């Protein structure tokens, strides 16, 4: 896990869960119905 991300990089999270900065929410891929939590490089 990453303290910056609040979630594992690339972790699938519920669609209404907001990824914490400095992250952004990837679209529904590759997790149908879910968002993918991504860290900025």
Curated annotation (Swiss-Prot):
UniProt keyword list: Disulfide bond, Nematocyst, Secreted
Key word Secreted present: yes
Expressed in which tissues: Expressed in tentacles.
Presence of keyword ATP-binding: no
Transmembrane portions of the chain: none
Listed GO CC annotations: extracellular region; nematocyst
Cellular localization per UniProt: Nematocyst; Secreted
Broad class of where this protein is predominantly found: other
S-S pairs: 5-37, 12-31, 19-38, 26-39
Protein origin, superkingdom: Eukaryota
Function text: Peptide with unknown function. Does not exhibit any effect on human ion channel TRPV1 in a Xenopus laevis oocytes assay.
Protein known as: Peptide Hact-SCRiP1
Top-level taxonomy: Eukaryota, Metazoa, Cnidaria, Anthozoa, Hexacorallia
